[in-house]
Amino acid sequence: MVSKSLIVLLLVSVLVSTFFTTEAYPASYDGDFDALDDLDDLDLDDLLDLEPADLVLLDMWANMLDSQDFEDFE
């Protein structure tokens, strides 16, 4: 019971932080692919300032690049 509540709480927190990230950075969700180029310029301070939703998006993007499905779109 506790583990289900914890999982639901974590999912809700990720969704809420993603919502606030889209409000704070609307250009990153409007097809602005220059944001991907900015990832090359990140240093340690930038990584420490990332929000949890940003880390989830970076992880999803890295997994997409590693997957075989991504190569089909090139």
Curated annotation (Swiss-Prot):
Keyword check for Secreted: yes
GO biological process: defense response to bacterium
Tissue and organ expression note: Expressed by the venom gland.
Cellular compartment(s): Secreted
GO cellular component term of the entry, any: extracellular region
N-terminal signal peptide: 1-24
Keywords, sorted A to Z: Antibiotic, Antimicrobial, Secreted, Signal
Family note: Belongs to the non-disulfide-bridged peptide (NDBP) superfamily. Long chain multifunctional peptide (group 2) family.
Function of the molecule: May be an antimicrobial peptide.
The name this protein goes by in its record: Anionic peptide clone 10
Taxonomic source organism: Tityus costatus (Brazilian scorpion)
